[in-house]
Amino acid sequence: MLKAIILIGGPQKGTRFRPLSFEVPKPLFPVAGVPMLQHHIEACAQVPDMKEIMLIGFYQPNDELNRFIYSAQQEFKIPIRYLQEFAALGTGGGIYHFRDQILSGGPAAFFLMNADVCSEFPLLEMLQFHRQHGENHCGVLLGTTANRTQSLNYGCIVENHETNEVLHFVEKPSTFVSDIINCGIYLFTPDIFAHIGKVFQRNQQEKIQEELTHGRQMPEVVRLEQDIFTALAGQKKLFVYKTQHFWSQIKSAGSAIYASRLYLKQYHQTHPERLATNQGGTPKITGDVYIHPTANIDPSAVLGPNVSIGKGVTIGGGVRVRESIILHGAVLQDHCCVLNSIVGWDSTVGKWARVEGTPSDPNPNDPYAKIDSETLFRDGGLTPSITILGCNVNIPSEVIIRNSIVLPHKDLNRSFKNQIIL
């Protein structure tokens, strides 16, 4: 028997995803036409003997989350429930807090994954790898290869090349340690809770001492990466399974467009029915495009590559859309152009208007390059990135919006470039 836990964070997390996370919890943001979390759940549902999927986070229960859980349970025929943390407890603290629920029924092992990663999720391969390495270890980490410079932005894993044992783990080192990075997808046995428990007890002692000595409240946080993996490395307790498949983080809104491209490409193998095709009376499709069945699109529009069109979207004649996500209820009027952008819910782009961003893709000449987590500002100016229109933004006709972020409910009356429009 197996279970899966997905860590979905909370409203204080994912701030780099604003203004899109104002309207919907980040894990429910649509990537390649379906909520981000659905890609995880689809992968979990394909694992034999998977009995339950748990979502752990500190969002208040809300209608969107409840609707998503209900529809996912109906579609995948597997129990899914949300466990709400009383505070942000960290990647290890959350699962330790709910250890009784996770261990109920006696699972032999459980998957743990972060919601903000995009991957092919090789869960079956990880399970087979786990079984090949015997009974005595307590976890398998999914790893991938990054280049030397970008590896410093991730948890770095030093492995024994013959046995794949994790010998050393450092979270975001200041100097180069290894080009194998942590993907945020794990397979644990119940033994992991004994190790988390030791750290939790030690932290409790330090917390009490700190409060007695200085009167400061310390959060009850246990971090898997810094507190658990670093301590267990080199003790034959952790192993790393290296994947050659695609993997990326989804930290910023710009990375959502890149993740959408990866998933749309994967649909050729997994869900070809989700990809739009060129047929009579339909818009011209170039490359991989997802179109919701309720969207109303003029046949003279040209879409793709890497375009996702949401529910109830209206697209007029002569419109060009490329490398973009168009969200629920948006209207693109005749002959407008949308490139490298996310158009928010119920927003309108006027006739002959142009909404354009700068792609934040990995270096195409480096096979191990990852997407850069750019800071919003650099050298006193806004870093050029994709353009984001928040919910219910109105772009008038013949206006150009380039490399800008527009917060929700704005009626613009002129062109903007490299600005955050509050």
UniProtKB/Swiss-Prot annotation:
InterPro entries assigned: GMPPB_C, Hexapep_transf_CS, Mannose-1P_guanyltransferase, NTP_transferase_dom, Nucleotide-diphossugar_trans
Effect of inactivating the gene: Morpholino knockdown of both gmppaa and gmppab results in muscle damage and shortened motor neurons.
Keyword annotations: GTP-binding, Nucleotide-binding, Nucleotidyltransferase, Transferase
Annotated positions binding GDP-alpha-D-mannose: E85, Q249
Gene Ontology CC annotation, any one: cytoplasm
Pathway where it operates: Nucleotide-sugar biosynthesis; GDP-alpha-D-mannose biosynthesis; GDP-alpha-D-mannose from alpha-D-mannose 1-phosphate (GTP route): step 1/1
Gene Ontology process terms (BP): GDP-mannose biosynthetic process
Residue ranges, annotated region (C-loop): 358-386
Classification via Pfam families: GMPPB_C (PF25087), NTP_transferase (PF00483)
Substrate-binding domain: annotated segments: 2-253
Molecular functions per Gene Ontology: GTP binding; mannose-1-phosphate guanylyltransferase (GTP) activity
PROSITE patterns, per the entry: HEXAPEP_TRANSFERASES (PS00101)
Protein family per UniProt: Belongs to the transferase hexapeptide repeat family.
PANTHER family xrefs: SUGAR-1-PHOSPHATE GUANYL TRANSFERASE
Assembly information from the UniProt record: Component of the GMPPA-GMPPB mannose-1-phosphate guanylyltransferase complex composed of 4 GMPPA subunits and 8 GMPPB subunits; the complex is organized into three layers, a central layer made up of 2 GMPPA dimers sandwiched between two layers each made up of 2 GMPPB dimers.
Function: Regulatory subunit of the GMPPA-GMPPB mannose-1-phosphate guanylyltransferase complex; reduces the catalytic activity of GMPPB when part of the complex. Mediates allosteric feedback inhibition of GMPPB catalytic activity upon binding GDP-alpha-D-mannose. Together with GMPPB regulates GDP-alpha-D-mannose levels. One of two paralogs (gmppaa and gmppab) that may have redundant functions.
Entry remark concerning the domains of this protein: The N-terminal substrate-binding domain adopts a Rossman-like fold and has a binding pocket for GTP or GDP-alpha-D-mannose. The C-terminal domain consists of a series of tandem hexapeptide repeats that adopt a beta-helix conformation. The beta-helix forms several protein interaction surfaces involved in assembly of the GMPPA-GMPPB mannose-1-phosphate guanylyltransferase complex. A loop extending from the C-terminal domain (C-loop) is involved in interaction with other subunits of the GMPPA-GMPPB complex and may be involved in allosteric inhibition of GMPPB catalytic activity by GMPPA.
Entry protein name: Mannose-1-phosphate guanylyltransferase regulatory subunit alpha-B
Organism, scientific name: Danio rerio
